[in-house]
């Protein structure tokens, strides 16, 4: 189990998880606000 935790804390694994989460957020934003180049605050 300790080796698995060390594996999960390596930079490539963390980067893959982070980019997957970021892509999901961007896909959902694009689904609710299509073709939004900027988000009006008012």
Curated annotation (Swiss-Prot):
It is found in: Plastid, Chloroplast thylakoid membrane. The chain crosses the membrane at residues 7-27. Coiled coil: none annotated. GO terms for biological process: photosynthesis. Disulfide bonds: none annotated. SUPFAM superfamilies: Subunit IX of photosystem I reaction centre, PsaJ. It is a single-pass membrane protein. Its main location: plastid. Belongs to the PsaJ family. This is Photosystem I reaction center subunit IX. The gene is psaJ.
